[in-house]
Structures are given as structure tokens and as C-alpha cells.
From Swiss-Prot:
UniProt source species: Hordeum vulgare (Barley)
InterPro entries cross-referenced by the UniProt entry: Gln_synt_N, Gln_synt_N_sf, Gln_synth/guanido_kin_cat_dom, Gln_synth_cat_dom, Gln_synth_gly_rich_site, Gln_synth_N_conserv_site, Glutamine_Synthetase
Domain GS beta-grasp: 19-99
Name by which UniProt lists this protein: Glutamine synthetase
Compartments it resides in: Cytoplasm
């Protein structure tokens, strides 16, 4: 008699050419990920070869009950680390039956901006540092924290090791390897300043693929925490008080910034961001005012500043970038719950397309 684990790990490649495709989309809150699976007659390597699909948008807060059908357009394919073999994860965006993007489809406008010829020729690179917090399932309290109590003050936890400093490493390492298997351009992980909080980095990725890959990496993380019986939150300030919040620092460069003379291009871009500070803050994640206080390695939400090697600034330029006269900058304002489609396209629009 086969056990449940045997069936979960069943290798289908020897018995059928069919594959399983897990279609992923963003739900009505703008942060909730949804997915469902279907089989296909054989391996698929490009999203244009995949069929569109549909779902009940009235059950995700994205359509009324009397006209509930929302259409999924496949946009990116990655390997499925849970089913393995030729099975795939499919990142989709969402449209009405008439082919119009629904309001929560932020990818559509992002793709328009990032495919603009003036943007495309600059080949924008993004490196996104996604922070998150692991919570004990039934009490919504950080992993490793005593129930109803607090751990010792911050200090020993950042990149810390040991059972009294590092909580959830099995989840984090599983996520790292699953992303690598799937084809996410994940570039690293580390424990964060607050215990129970972690970070993974995606990038450098070019253009719209940055958003696709961050969303799929989030999906993989939520699936792994589901298996582990742990909750992941992207709340930018999950614990009030003298504890670090959670951000999604976004590193960015263009071809002009990476070439000789690029430092001036960086300074000009950062000055543009200062002029659009309020608009960017409004789009950089909900609850960010609880995080951007001017404390805990953040700038105050009401001010816009930049500096070399300054982690208390809105935008940080690396010391190496200054020395080389070219490179990239880091926008430290985005919250952990930001939409990477919105943030990446908005930075490109402000720094490349906008003429003040």
C-alpha cells in the first residue's frame, strides 16, 4: 500500500508525457497569491505556447458574481520545485473576457513602461531585497519568540547562527534551493536584524522579469511555509516598538549608469526621485509609515534624502559606485509588501522617461 508521501513524490515521467502546470495569479488584495493546476499533453518551454485559463473572480474579490469570469494570461514559466520533472509554475496576469486588464493587474502597465524603447535601450537591472517575517501559526507571533513575551534586544540576530539566534533556517534554505531549481535568479539569503525575520535577494534581473521572479519567489516561499505549518507575513512593521521593520530595498541601474560617467547619471536620477517622493511613497506599499520613521535604518517617510553608504537615507549609493564613478543605487523606501511590478516600472518611468 502506497503512503501519502509516496504518492506526493510519484514520478510521472515513466508513465505519461503529460505535465502539470500550476497557474499562479495575484488576488484581490494585491498581495494574496492564488494558484490552481491543470495538465498539458507535453512539456512547454514558452508562455506563448500555453492556453489561457479562467477562474471565479467573485471568490477572489476581483469580479461580481453575475459576471465572475476572469481570464488568466500566461506570462512566465519556471520549473516546479514541488512536483519536479517537466512540471511547471506559470506566472499569469488577469484580464476581463473582453481582454481588458482588471484593476489589480499591475503587470500590464509595468510591461508597457518597461518595453518602451527609451527604457528598453537602457536595459534596467533590478536587484530586490525581499524581507519577510515567519510567524507561529496559531498565535501570529514571530518564530522563536516566547509566547506572550519577547526575546533579547536586537544585535545578535542579524546573520546570526545558533538555536538561540536563528529561527526558521530550514524554511529559508529550502526556499533558496527551490528557487534555484525553479529558475528564479535568487542571489542570496540572510537572517535579519529582528529575530524571526529573514531576507532573500532576487537579481540582477532585467525589466519585467524582475516582477515576475519576485512574485514567483514569494509563491514558492508561501508554499514551503504551508508545508512547514508556519505563516509568512510581508507586513512592513509586524512588531511595534524597538524592532526593525521589513522592507524590499530595490537596487537599480541603467546602461548609462553602468558605463563610464555613470555616477552623474545616478545623481541626476536620484534628484528626479526626490522630486517625485510623495508619488513613490504612495505606491511603495501599505503601512510603510509604520516602518519609515527615521529609526531602525530607515529615512523618515516625509523626507527625501540620499547619501553614499548611508543606510539612514531614502536612497543609498554604494561606496564602490562612488569610487568607480559608475554602478547602481539602492532605493530603500519600498516596503516588504510592495508590488514589484509597480516599483520597478515606476523607478524606470521617473528616472528615464520623466522630463522635469
Amino acid at each position: 500500500m502506497a503512503l501519502l508521501t509516496d504518492l506526493l513524490n510519484l514520478d510521472l515521467s515513466g508513465s505519461t508525457e503529460k505535465i502539470i502546470a500550476e497557474y499562479i495569479w495575484i488576488g484581490g488584495s494585491g498581495m494574496d497569491l492564488r494558484s490552481k493546476a491543470r495538465h498539458l499533453p507535453g512539456p512547454v518551454t514558452h508562455p506563448s505556447k500555453l492556453p489561457k485559463w479562467n477562474y471565479d473572480g467573485s471568490s477572489t474579490g476581483q469580479a461580481p458574481g453575475e459576471d465572475s469570469e476572469v481570464i488568466l494570461y500566461p506570462q512566465a514559466i519556471l520549473k516546479d520545485p514541488f512536483r519536479e520533472g517537466n512540471n511547471i509554475l506559470v506566472m499569469c496576469d488577469c484580464y476581463t473576457p473582453r481582454g481588458e486588464p482588471i484593476p489589480t493587474n499591475k503587470r500590464y502597465n509595468a510591461a508597457k513602461i518597461l518595453s518602451n524603447p527609451d527604457v528598453a535601450k537602457e536595459e534596467p537591472w533590478y536587484g530586490i531585497e525581499q524581507e519577510y517575517t515567519l510567524l507561529q501559526k496559531d498565535i501570529n507571533w514571530p518564530l522563536g519568540w516566547p509566547v506572550g513575551g519577547f526575546p533579547g534586544p536586537q544585535g545578535p540576530y542579524y546573520c546570526g547562527i545558533g538555536a538561540d539566534k536563528s529561527f526558521g533556517r530550514d524554511i529559508v534554505d529550502s526556499h533558496y534551493k527551490a528557487c534555484l531549481f525553479g529558475g528564479v535568479n535568487i542571489s542570496g539569503i540572510n537572517g535579519e536584524v529582528m529575530p524571526g525575520q529573514w531576507e532573500f535577494q532576487v537579481g540582477p534581473t532585467v525589466g519585467i522579469s524582475a516582477g515576475d521572479q519576485v512574485w514567483v519567489a514569494r509563491y514558492i516561499l508561501e508554499r514551503i511555509t504551508e508545508i512547514a505549518g508556519v505563516v509568512v507575513t510581508f507586513d512592513p512593521k509586524p512588531i511595534p516598538g524597538d524592532w526593525n521593520g521589513a522592507g524590499a530595498h530595490t537596487n537599480y541601474s541603467t546602461e548609462s549608469m553602468r558605463n563610464d560617467g555613470g555616477f552623474k547619471v545616478i545623481v541626476d536620477a536620484v534628484e528626479k526621485l526626490k522630486l517625485k517622493h510623495k508619488e513613490h511613497i504612495a505606491a511603495y506599499g501599505e503601512g510603510n509609515e509604520r516602518r519609515l520613521t527615521g529609526k531602525h535604518e530607515t529615512a523618515d517617510i516625509n523626507t527625501s534624502s540620499w547619501g553614499v553608504a548611508n543606510r539612514g537615507a531614502s536612497v543609498r549609493v554604494g561606496r564602490e559606485t562612488e569610487q568607480n564613478g559608475k554602478g547602481y543605487f539602492e532605493d530603500r523606501r519600498p516596503a516588504s509588501n510592495m508590488d514589484p511590478y509597480v516599483v520597478t516600472s515606476m523607478i524606470a518611468q521617473t528616472t528615464i522617461l520623466w522630463k522635469p
